[in-house]
């Protein structure tokens, strides 16, 4: 089952548009899922706004979700930013703390940590720091 946060208009040249679900409709999607067939795991991908991030975090807590995977899709393959500036901090504060597994790529790791990833060792350092928080 899926809950759709946004639709994108994109191709190999870039993203030309993003149409987000409203927080109310997105919450209705999550409620429909969690009150029917309870998911064994939750995978979170692109979430563009802080309002939708808050909606997800609230639902995960309310429904006591387990096995949460956060793939913080923040930049498209073509380099277009997919998350609003004010949403990245909320993602760190509300979703990263709930996730069992976080799978950022290098550009996403740099956005989330504010540091430059220049080696495999630096990735391990960021992983260790995140685990300590």
In which residue ranges do the predicted regions lie?
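Conserved N-terminal subdomain of the carbohydrate kinase-like
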Residues: 1-70, 74-77, 81
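Conserved beta-alpha-beta core of the PfkB/ribokinase-like small-molecule kinase fold
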Residues: 44, 49-125
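Conserved small/polar residues in nucleotide/adenosyl-binding loops
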Residues: 126-131
């Amino acid at each position: 089952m899926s809950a759709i946060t946004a639709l994108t208009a994109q191709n190999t040249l870039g993203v030309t548009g993003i149409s987000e679900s409203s927080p109310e409709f997105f919450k209705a999607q999550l409620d429909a899922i969690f009150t029917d067939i309870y998911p064994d795991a939750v995978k979170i991908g692109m979430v563009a706004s802080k309002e939708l991030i808050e909606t997800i975090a609230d639902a995960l807590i309310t429904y006591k979700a387990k096995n949460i995977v956060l793939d913080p899709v923040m930049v498209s393959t073509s380099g277009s930013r997919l998350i609003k500036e004010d949403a990245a901090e909320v993602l760190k504060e509300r979703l990263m703390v709930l996730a069992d597994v976080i799978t950022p790529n290098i550009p996403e790791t740099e956005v989330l940590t504010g540091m430059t990833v220049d080696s495999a060792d630096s990735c391990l350092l960021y992983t260790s720091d995140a685990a300590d928080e």
